[in-house]
């Protein structure tokens, strides 16, 4: 089985969020179970610096009329997974992020940049002599690759089949209809049964419409996006594609996130008895973040973007009561300046009980995951989520809202003998405060606390598990008829 991953980011070459983690780790996990998985990624400056290039190039001419284009062969620096960088200096050789300028404004030619990625992926899939390698399946990710099957549809190509993975429905890839002429797609696709969405082109919709199969990053999120709450206006289409829609929970990199060998921890954490290692790491985190070291107090961690989706406003509302009840809080993240200011205000009012580090620090992220007694993940919606998976692996008990991947990965400790965390239902301050109170009650029962930690650490959230599920989807696509709208 040969699979080409088409993606706009892949860790450690370039990453802005969870998509980068998936696209970096899943191909390697698939290769471990016998799949010939390879990655196609734009040749951003960071990717060019970090990839291990072989020196082999394949000229592609000027397939989109935006400049000379070529493929650069290489491998991923950490896993050795085969890689092709799509080199078009006019599109990708620029300072800033993969999607935005340093100012935070989207690149105005994003439609061209990712149409080129999509068109070249379709070319690789249909031109057997292009790379001396032809994929059995094309696997694209999010709106940036939604035009891959649109090109295949326009060319009348029935193979290879395309799997479209949705990591976040909020990003729909919306552009004016005039782009179709500029990127070489027929106007006939601009219809309610094609890629038209309220008078605009939606590349996310294109992926859903023209792909043979659709996947998302957790079973619960697959159900949620078929409803008005989660579907972002595309729920009817997703209901129609329900038979082709899979929800596969993301995995984690069990080498990078290994509580026995993590170099960022002050001491290893043993799944058979997490308490001693947790205690040492907790002491280290308190010293690093300036939290009071005296007393046996529950420590809550939060590692998150500071945005409304993540429920940070709920945390702001709950913090004074938590601290009054004897808890301490260690927070890492960045985002909305108003939420940053609110968190910093609480730190100023409760020195020694609350600490915030604004920004991202990989060392501190690992230390919080390993040191905290509980991890707060009160998201309003969460397609999958990774921090709760890291927490479980490190013996930290997640406090999560019942949504998306949080619901699939954390079971409430009062719902049966195998509970691994504390789960609440509503995105309201009172609901989070109830969950925090339940956590503080658990903390006082040290024997039960350690058992819940042990259960969490015994869970399997490896990419190998996820890779086997994707392999089953690929197999069904290769053996079945290709969906056409």
Swiss-Prot record:
The keyword Oxidoreductase appears for this protein: no
EC number(s) per entry: 2.4.1.21
SUPFAM superfamilies listed in its UniProt record: UDP-Glycosyltransferase/glycogen phosphorylase (SSF53756)
Record-listed ADP-alpha-D-glucose binding positions: 15
Biochemical pathway: Glycan biosynthesis; glycogen biosynthesis
Ranges in coiled-coil conformation: none
Family annotation (InterPro entries): Glyco_trans_1, GS/SS, Starch_synth_cat_dom
Keyword field: Glycogen biosynthesis, Glycosyltransferase, Transferase
Keyword Transferase: yes
Top-rank taxon: Bacteria
Catalytic activity: [(1->4)-alpha-D-glucosyl](n) + ADP-alpha-D-glucose = [(1->4)-alpha-D-glucosyl](n+1) + ADP + H(+)
Molecular-function annotations in GO: alpha-1,4-glucan glucosyltransferase (ADP-glucose donor) activity; alpha-1,4-glucan glucosyltransferase (UDP-glucose donor) activity
A Pfam entry, by short name: Glycos_transf_1
Regions crossing the membrane: none
One GO BP: glycogen biosynthetic process
Role description: Synthesizes alpha-1,4-glucan chains using ADP-glucose.
Entry similarity comment: Belongs to the glycosyltransferase 1 family. Bacterial/plant glycogen synthase subfamily.
Descriptive protein name: Glycogen synthase
Organism: Rhodospirillum rubrum (strain ATCC 11170 / ATH 1.1.1 / DSM 467 / LMG 4362 / NCIMB 8255 / S1)
Upper taxonomic lineage: Bacteria, Pseudomonadati, Pseudomonadota, Alphaproteobacteria, Rhodospirillales
Gene name as annotated: glgA
């Amino acid at each position: 089985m040969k699979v080409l991953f088409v993606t706009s980011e892949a860790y450690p070459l370039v990453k802005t969020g969870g998509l980068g983690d998936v696209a970096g780790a899943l191909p390697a996990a698939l290769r471990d179970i016998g799949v010939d998985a390879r990655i196609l990624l734009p040749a951003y400056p960071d990717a060019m610096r970090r990839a291990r290039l072989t020196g082999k190039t394949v000229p592609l001419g000027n397939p989109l009329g935006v400049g000379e284009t070529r493929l650069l062969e290489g491998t991923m620096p950490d896993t050795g997974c085969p890689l092709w960088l799509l080199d078009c200096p006019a599109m990708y050789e620029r300072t800033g992020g993969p999607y935005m300028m340093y100012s935070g404004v989207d690149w105005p030619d994003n439609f061209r940049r990712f149409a080129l990625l999509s068109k070249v992926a379709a070319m690789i899939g249909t031109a057997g002599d292009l790379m001396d390698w032809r994929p059995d399946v094309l696997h694209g990710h999010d709106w940036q690759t939604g035009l891959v099957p649109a090109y295949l549809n326009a060319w009348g190509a029935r193979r290879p089949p395309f799997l479209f993975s949705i990591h976040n429905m909020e990003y729909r890839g919306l552009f004016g209809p005039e782009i179709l002429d500029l990127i070489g797609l027929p106007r006939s696709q601009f219809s309610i049964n094609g890629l038209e969405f309220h008078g605009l082109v939606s590349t996310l919709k294109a992926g859903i419409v023209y792909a043979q199969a659709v996947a998302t990053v957790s079973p619960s999120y697959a159900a949620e996006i078929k409803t008005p709450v989660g579907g972002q206006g595309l729920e009817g289409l997703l209901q129609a594609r329900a038979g082709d829609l899979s929800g596969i929970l993301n995995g984690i990199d069990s080498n990078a996130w290994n509580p026995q060998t993590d170099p960022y921890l002050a001491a290893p954490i043993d799944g058979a008895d997490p308490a001693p290692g947790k205690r040492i790491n907790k002491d280290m985190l308190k010293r690093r973040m300036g939290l009071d070291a005296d007393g046996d107090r529950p420590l809550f961690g939060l590692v998150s973007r500071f945005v409304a989706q993540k429920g940070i406003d709920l945390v702001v509302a709950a913090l004074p009561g938590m601290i009054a009840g004897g808890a301490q809080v260690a927070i890492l993240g960045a985002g909305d300046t108003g939420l940053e200011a609110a968190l910093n205000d609480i730190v100023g009012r409760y020195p020694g009980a609350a600490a915030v580090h604004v920004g991202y620090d990989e060392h501190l992220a690992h230390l919080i995951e390993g040191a905290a007694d509980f991890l707060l993940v009160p998201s309003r919606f969460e397609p999958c989520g990774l921090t709760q998976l890291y927490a479980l692996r490190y013996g930290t008990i997640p406090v999560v809202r019942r949504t998306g991947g949080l619901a699939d990965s954390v079971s409430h400790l009062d719902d049966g003998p195998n509970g691994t965390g504390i789960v609440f239902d509503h995105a309201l301050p009172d609901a989070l405060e109830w969950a925090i109170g339940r956590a503080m009650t658990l903390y006082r029962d040290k024997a039960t606390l350690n058992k819940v930690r042990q259960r969490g650490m015994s869970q399997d959230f490896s990419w190998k598990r996820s890779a086997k599920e994707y392999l089953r989807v690929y197999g069904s696509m290769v053996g079945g008829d290709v969906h056409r709208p």
